[in-house]
Amino acid sequence: MIPGEIKTDSGDRELNVGRPRIKIKVANAGDRPIQVGSHYHFYEVNNALKFDREATKGYRLDITSSTAIRFEPGQEREVTLIPYQGSRTVIGFQGKVQGVLS
């Protein structure tokens, strides 16, 4: 075994099993690509991304940890989001929440 190595069973893994999900259409109205990371509070992403922002409060992308989705200028796509778990405290990002989600 290599130090830090993690051995797992073979096969694919399903992420966030049993978690509620929402799908939302997102469009990049800006003139530059925008990349959003796996754990970024979607409600607080770049303002050039157009979507029903209020519906995404307390949600993040349903993608593998440490990965991201890139939105090219003019691109529209549907993304899947999952709610934050645990204490549901959101601090940082654009500073729009700064505390516990309701």
Curated annotation (Swiss-Prot):
Alphabetized UniProt keyword annotations: Cytoplasm, Hydrolase
Segments traversing the membrane: none
Pfam families, per database record: Urease_beta (PF00699)
One Gene Ontology term of the molecular function aspect: urease activity
Localization (cell): Cytoplasm
Enzyme class, broadest EC rank: hydrolase
Catalytic activities: urea + 2 H2O + H(+) = hydrogencarbonate + 2 NH4(+)
SUPFAM superfamilies: Urease, beta-subunit
Superkingdom field: Bacteria
Presence of the UniProt keyword Hydrolase in the record: yes
CDD domains associated with the record: Urease_beta
EC number: 3.5.1.5
An annotated GO BP: urea catabolic process
Pathway: Nitrogen metabolism; urea degradation; CO(2) and NH(3) from urea (urease route): step 1/1
Any one cellular-component term (Gene Ontology): urease complex
Subunit structure as annotated in this protein's UniProt entry: Heterotrimer of UreA (gamma), UreB (beta) and UreC (alpha) subunits. Three heterotrimers associate to form the active enzyme.
Name of this chain's protein: Urease subunit beta
Biological source species: Alteromonas mediterranea (strain DSM 17117 / CIP 110805 / LMG 28347 / Deep ecotype)
